[in-house]
Amino acid sequence: MQPQRDLRGLWLLLLSVFLLLFEVARAGRSVVSCPANCLCASNILSCSKQQLPNVPQSLPSYTALLDLSHNNLSRLRAEWTPTRLTNLHSLLLSHNHLNFISSEAFVPVPNLRYLDLSSNHLHTLDEFLFSDLQALEVLLLYNNHIVVVDRNAFEDMAQLQKLYLSQNQISRFPVELIKDGNKLPKLMLLDLSSNKLKKLPLTDLQKLPAWVKNGLYLHNNPLECDCKLYQLFSHWQYRQLSSVMDFQEDLYCMHSKKLHNIFSLDFFNCSEYKESAWEAHLGDTLTIRCDTKQQGMTKVWVSPSNEQVLSQGSNGSVSVRNGDLFFKKVQVEDGGVYTCYAMGETFNETLSVELKVYNFTLHGHHDTLNTAYTTLVGCILSVVLVLIYLYLTPCRCWCRGVEKPSSHQGDSLSSSMLSTTPNHDPMAGGDKDDGFDRRVAFLEPAGPGQGQNGKLKPGNTLPVPEATGKGQRRMSDPESVSSVFSDTPIVV
């Protein structure tokens, strides 16, 4: 019996020690769970408005919401909390003096979904600054002094839905955040209002789905006035997008150092916006989106004949794929107005799209290339021919023989009726006209033995000309045509 009593006493002693340790641990936990200058309520810790220069240490690991706003925090280092806060989903750091955040500052809070860094003194968002926050859904960075946003600052944040960057000094539109929807696929709100944006990537903005444009806020920026900008926001106004409808008076642009409302650009002679129809040609493959203002809506398409378009393509070549209208090969009878009825949990929307079909096919790329090539070759050949005509003289034909001197009789008929050569020998002396350069055209004069009209006088004979030099003029044939009216010189 004695051993049993000793064993029972030992068990009682161990139980007492265990209970004592449990109470001590619970008391210690109650001390750690609520740091000084903080208000604790279950898993919520509020340390706001305490003028804290540093984050309180020994934060309980079960903390789900930590409020450190309205304090004097200036730096958020990598070791700001020695405890890994895996249960923390909301961290409030607004209205502090933060000007530095370590790239490893968010390693202890991997499951954070809500982060408020607004109203601080941040200047730069470095690359991979938030890459450890892969579960983050809402990020508030408004009312800082941000000038530079690195292109990789928001890497690996596939769950981010709302990003607030308003009231900063950003001058470059971070197009990488929205282009193609790959970096932030769930982003539905991007607030860039009240910054220093002057130019927008209009082409990329036009391609965005309506549910992204609906939450893209760009008001209160000194945008450069342009008709393309007017067309962009007019389209958003036509679609009744919240980003435009809620801030119409604050959407302005800058021209000649003056602000103008974007929707009053009459002095630019901008064309009035009209919703354009889709255009297609015979045989084209076409996809028309049901561009709703919300994601995840159920979509139903109705054809111009008021029939529902099914995914199996019961209406000819038309079918529905992933909520979009798909035409395998466009036909003439496919033209008309299609209506998309979109239904969501809290919002319904109706969209109408007009399709115009042209009754011909477009030339292929190969034909277009051939036409352009032919035109180019024709132009080059034309230029070459013109250059040859202008600058290259005809070649002398060396195959022709040397011409023999013609006889006097042959020359009589081919002699010129008008001659610029004086009818005297320039080598003879004693002539009054020697040295006098008079340009006179003569008809062939009559010979000394000729009578009127070049006829021979009776008893006279025709003198034979002597061999002379080049300057000696040959006598004309008395029966030649050139002897007619031969006595009168013509002065030129």
Swiss-Prot record:
PROSITE patterns: IG_LIKE, LRR. Residues 407-423 have a biased composition (Polar residues). Glycans are attached at residues 72, 269, 315, 348, 359. It comes from the Eukaryota. Changing residue 348 to A: Prevents from leaving the ER. Residues 393-492 are cytoplasmic. Residues 269-352 form the Ig-like C2-type domain. Homodimer, and heterodimer with AMIGO2 and AMIGO3. Interacts with KCNB1. Promotes growth and fasciculation of neurites from cultured hippocampal neurons. May be involved in fasciculation as well as myelination of developing neural axons. May have a role in regeneration as well as neural plasticity in the adult nervous system. May mediate homophilic as well as heterophilic cell-cell interaction and contribute to signal transduction through its intracellular domain. Assembled with KCNB1 modulates the gating characteristics of the delayed rectifier voltage-dependent potassium channel KCNB1. The LRR repeat region mediates homodimerization. Belongs to the immunoglobulin superfamily. AMIGO family. This is Amphoterin-induced protein 1. It comes from Mus musculus. The lineage of its organism: Eukaryota, Metazoa, Chordata, Craniata, Vertebrata.
